């Protein structure tokens, strides 16, 4: 059997060359998008009088039959036909005969595959946004229940200041909100149609690219045919946005892993999202969180891979671009799976407020409160910082905490310190008083929750 492009060749490729050059193993995932693109293209060819009405009807009927078989997973593809485009054309030829050869009029596989990927990512991005929103709901629900749950806040992984657990959870809510905004904004650039650009220079046929774009639901058409077939910015942008999202999930998972350890005991991860050890009977491992953390690396790797592939390509199409798909497919699967796991894990997560609160009572995370206390009494902040630092040093030497010091010791360092200092140094006061906008104070966090609720009320795809 001759290749569909085989007219110029005297020799046929060997089986191992066919296997090396074929992409059907992975681009079969574009089967529905490819069929949709072909239907729009053929409809446009008919509208423009390039194909006869009966030819259009015959081809569309055949494509519809292939679509039904695709939905039923009944299509069989062959490596010999290289990719999804030529496999479908061969199957169409079997179904309706030689008229199938007219389907590819005024089209190249270059604009065809680009169209497929635009269609594919357009829907996958919407699905990712919906999954982000599901995780945001879980975070918001836990935050609403834990406004006055006090926990240590950290810098350098050292206890820094007590904060509200809700405040900590909402930090991730806002990270996800930015992720969602980036994905949403990227749809503007995914929503361009390359169909009709041909191999690189357009076509001599009187096609209507706006009509095929309209049929496919695209908002605009690439104005340059070279750019249309060689552009992979929209995939790179998706991979970049996905990498940032996975980085956020990885950071959160790192904290969940720490919090679930015996050293913290801030949370209990549900058995549903944990595994055991084949050797150590006592083990309960937060494997799902660890996997999400680990999978962030492969998504970032997919971005680096495509950036490296693209950096040396001259215009327009090059076979290298066949390598753009596997990383895209892998990233879609990884991101969607990670978001689903995270939402489920958060839904069944148990927090331990008593353990969190206790952790803030046996440390020096209230030292900033003492410095602020002295500053409010009229001492310049730098002097207050110095006095507080010397008091902390004294406590460390004496193996005491600030609230355990007698008032006489406090007043040795500053006569401004009075009995009311003990109330000011409680974790509750340390958190409650920080009501600047965006702060961890209970009132400020309640206002923040209201802002988050507004975001949730306008969720795009839920």
Swiss-Prot record:
Entry's Pfam families?
ASL_C2 (PF14698), Lyase_1 (PF00206)
Cite the EC number. Answer: 4.3.2.1
What's an example GO cellular component term for this entry?
Answer: cytosol
Record's keyword terms, sorted: Amino-acid biosynthesis, Arginine biosynthesis, Cytoplasm, Lyase
Alphabetized Gene3D superfamilies for the sequence: Fumarase/aspartase (C-terminal domain), Fumarase/aspartase (Central domain), Fumarase/aspartase (N-terminal domain)
Q: Which domain of life is it from?
A: Bacteria
Range of residues in the leader sequence? none
Give compartment(s): Cytoplasm
What is the predominant subcellular site recorded for this chain? cytoplasm
**What pathway annotation does it carry?**
Amino-acid biosynthesis; L-arginine biosynthesis; L-arginine from L-ornithine and carbamoyl phosphate: step 3/3
Biological process (GO) annotations held by this record are: arginine biosynthetic process via ornithine; L-arginine biosynthetic process
Under the heading CDD domains, the entry gives:
Argininosuccinate_lyase
Q: Which family does it belong to?
A: Belongs to the lyase 1 family. Argininosuccinate lyase subfamily.
Q: Which PANTHER family match?
A: ARGININOSUCCINATE LYASE (PTHR43814:SF1)
Protein name as annotated: Argininosuccinate lyase
Q: Tell me the gene name.
A: argH
């Amino acid at each position: 059997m001759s290749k569909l492009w085989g007219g110029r060749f005297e020799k046929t490729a060997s089986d191992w060359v066919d296997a090396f050059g074929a992409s059907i193993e992975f681009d079969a995932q574009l089967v529905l998008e490819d069929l949709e693109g072909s239907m729009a293209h053929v409809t446009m060819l008919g509208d423009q009088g390039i194909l006869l009405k009966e030819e259009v009807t015959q081809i569309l009927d055949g494509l519809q039959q292939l679509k039904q078989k695709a939905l039923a997973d009944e299509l069989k593809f062959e490596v010999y036909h290289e990719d999804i485009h030529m496999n479908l054309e061969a199957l169409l030829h079997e179904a309706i005969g030689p008229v199938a050869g007219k389907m590819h009029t005024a089209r190249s596989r270059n604009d065809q595959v680009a169209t497929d990927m635009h269609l594919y990512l357009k829907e996958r991005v919407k699905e990712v946004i919906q999954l982000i929103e599901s995780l945001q709901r879980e975070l918001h629900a836990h935050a609403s229940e834990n406004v006055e749950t006090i926990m240590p806040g950290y810098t350098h992984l050292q206890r820094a200041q007590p904060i509200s657990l809700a405040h900590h959870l909402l930090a991730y809510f806002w990270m996800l909100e930015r992720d969602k905004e980036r994905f949403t904004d990227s749809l503007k650039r995914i929503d361009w149609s390359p169909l009709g650009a041909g191999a690189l220079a357009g076509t001599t046929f009187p096609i209507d690219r706006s009509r095929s774009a309209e049929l496919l639901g695209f908002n605009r058409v690439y104005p340059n045919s070279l750019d249309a077939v060689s552009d992979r910015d929209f995939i790179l942008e998706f991979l970049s946005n996905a990498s940032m999202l996975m980085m956020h999930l990885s950071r959160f998972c790192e904290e969940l892993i720490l919090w679930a350890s015996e050293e913290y005991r801030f949370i209990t991860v549900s058995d549903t999202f944990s595994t055991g050890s084949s050797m150590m009977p006592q083990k309960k491992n937060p494997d799902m969180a660890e996997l999400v953390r680990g999978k962030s690396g492969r998504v970032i790797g997919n971005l680096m891979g495509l950036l490296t592939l693209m950096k040396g390509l001259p215009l327009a199409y090059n076979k290298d671009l066949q390598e753009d798909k596997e990383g895209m497919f892998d990233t879609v699967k990884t991101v969607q799976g990670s978001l689903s796991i995270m939402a489920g894990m958060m839904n069944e997560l148990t927090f331990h407020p008593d353990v969190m609160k206790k952790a803030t009572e046996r440390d020096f995370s209230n030292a900033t409160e003492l410095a602020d206390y002295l500053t409010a009494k009229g001492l310049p902040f730098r002097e207050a910082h110095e006095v507080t630092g010397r008091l902390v040093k004294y406590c460390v030497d004496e193996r005491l905490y600030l609230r355990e010091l007698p008032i006489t010791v406090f007043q040795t360092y500053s006569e401004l310190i009075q009995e009311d200092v003990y109330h000011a140094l409680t974790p509750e006061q340390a958190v409650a008083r920080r009501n600047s906008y965006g702060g961890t104070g209970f009132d400020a966090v309640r206002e923040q929750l209201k802002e988050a609720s507004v975001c949730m009320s306008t969720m795009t795809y839920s």
